Amino acid sequence: MEQTVHVPLGARAYDVVIGPDLVAQAGQRIAPLLRRKTVAVLTDETVAALHLEALRAGLAADGIEMEALALPPGEATKGWPQFTRAVEWLLDKKVERGDIVIAFGGGVIGDLAGFAAAVLRRGVRFVQIPTSLLAQVDSSVGGKTGINAPQGKNLIGAFHQPSLVLADTAVLGTLTERDFLAGYGEVVKYGLLGDAAFFDWLEENAPAMAAGDMALRVEAVARSVQMKADIVARDETEQGDRALLNLGHTFCHALEAATGYSDRLLHGEGVAIGCALAFELSARLGLCSQEDPSRVRAHLKAMGMKTDLSDIPGDLPPAQELLDLMAQDKKVVDGQLRFILARGIGAAFVTADVPSEKVLEVLQEALAHTQPA
């Protein structure tokens, strides 16, 4: 059932191994990378309570000792205070340049631990063991690491590729339904941006996958990772094609900022809503048929996901304010907002040529549905 996706980046190439029970095999998988039989693990309190002893046992099976620091769970951890704490802890533990740091958690831990590894002693190697669906299909692959600033998400960071990624699909069984579906937002994104056949496959198989079918989970993660690996190999530092991976993210980042990066909206939920809005905008601009956004929404709804602004609890700011938040996005070039739009399902492209009044129209219409009648 296990699948391996190779990320071909020359001297920085690595494998992403996908399958059940990889945490139990962590020792034998990581041992070839080690110069001495000890590792430092960064995790969060939720993951630690559920899985840290299993990781300790998996490492001990190969005679590897581990020390672990568990940070508070949640997006708020991804800032200077906890980052400083993590780096100083790694220094206290005398992590050397030849050692390995393990990122054991979801996207927040992966981003923070990867960035800590990137700056520690000017760069130590790290291994990703992503525990959420979102991290397995997205943030653990591709080497983007970083933390948030008061001015916006992911504005402080570095490109630092992992040495190995172990995506244990059995661990996904401990996710809440909400977290699993939030991660699924990123899975759908891959079908929407470049693989119509994968989107067809998801329409047919995703309900059974969400219900727990392990072979389908491995397949969905592997296909997502393969697609990301192909794009990252073509464009590691996001000069061109890699921007396609941001489908739905320009809307998403504005919505996350508007909701204060809180639990009102999880990142993957924002991506799903953002993808629906990006297709809506594409149809509005005459790039794709109106059937495409309808099909996107129908699938997200069938999966029980957030699809509209009205699905976000609480009040949202007016359309112009959301548009202003979009301008804070990292994808701004020469003051122009870059959007990822679509000529159809599986046919996304990057453009800066989007009239802001059209974006405003789509936002105003989406917000109109949130007002109580």
Curated annotation (Swiss-Prot):
Q: Which InterPro entries match?
A: Dehydroquinate_synthase, DHQ_synth_AroB, DHQ_synth_fam, DHQS/DOIS_N, DHQS_C
Reaction catalysis annotation = 7-phospho-2-dehydro-3-deoxy-D-arabino-heptonate = 3-dehydroquinate + phosphate
Sites where the protein binds Zn(2+): 186, 249, 267
GO biological process terms, alphabetically, are: amino acid biosynthetic process; aromatic amino acid family biosynthetic process; chorismate biosynthetic process
Q: Name one Pfam family in it.
A: DHQ_synthase
Chief location: cytoplasm
Pathway-wise, it operates in:
Metabolic intermediate biosynthesis; chorismate biosynthesis; chorismate from D-erythrose 4-phosphate and phosphoenolpyruvate: step 2/7
UniProt entry keywords in alphabetical sequence:
Amino-acid biosynthesis, Aromatic amino acid biosynthesis, Cobalt, Cytoplasm, Lyase, Metal-binding, NAD, Nucleotide-binding, Zinc
Q: Which GO terms describe its cellular component?
A: cytoplasm
Q: Which GO terms describe its molecular function?
A: 3-dehydroquinate synthase activity; metal ion binding; nucleotide binding
Is Zinc one of the keywords? Answer: yes
Q: What is this protein called?
A: 3-dehydroquinate synthase
